[in-house]
Amino acid sequence: QKTPGPQRGTDMKKKILILISILIILIQIYLLSVLAISALYPISHINEEDLSYLRQKTKGINHLMIVAHPDDESIWGGAHLLEEDYLVVCLTNGSCQAREQEFQAALEQTGDVGIILNYPDKILGLRSGWRFQRKSVIQDLEKILSLKQWDTVATHNQDGEYGHIQHRLTHSPALRAFD
């Protein structure tokens, strides 16, 4: 026995609503998972041993560059690195050995010193907004800024060059820590 026309349309609408509801629930579960993992993401903060190492490595270096990712120092600040000696602090990708090696090799070529912190770049495929790490980013940058009186502090612009979220997020704490 066939369902009458108007009834069939109502059944179809119910099925579509159920599918949409299931999809929304799955998206929410995924986003909550990202938030949970982000909150639990292991961060090793700058400690006294790191600061001692940086004090030793930056003797005679009075310029500081703070970037979000390895290669940002070359793309956005390459001219600075060629003109002066810099300590370059990179906030993300401390867990990616290949990027760290490329970063260190680039700095060797320009005679600069660098450190990569391990703030998350992506979590479960989504760009991290450092929601749970912002306070830690500021604290780590404050420690680095307090190492000495820097002649120059260079970082991403407030627009993140082309709107990149982590470039913008690097700009804000760098300025807050510098104030």
Task: Identify what each model region corresponds to.
Residues 15-19, 27-148, 175-176:
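Active-site rim/loop-helix segments in enzyme catalytic domains that contact anionic ligands
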Residues 158, 162-178:
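Catalytic domains of cell-wall/extracellular-matrix polysaccharide-remodeling enzymes
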Residues 145, 149-159:
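Proline-aspartate-enriched helix->loop->beta-strand connector
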Residues 66-70, 156, 165:
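Short His-Asn-centered micro-motif
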Residues 1-11:
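Short, Lys/Arg-enriched N-terminal segments with co-localized hydrophobic residues
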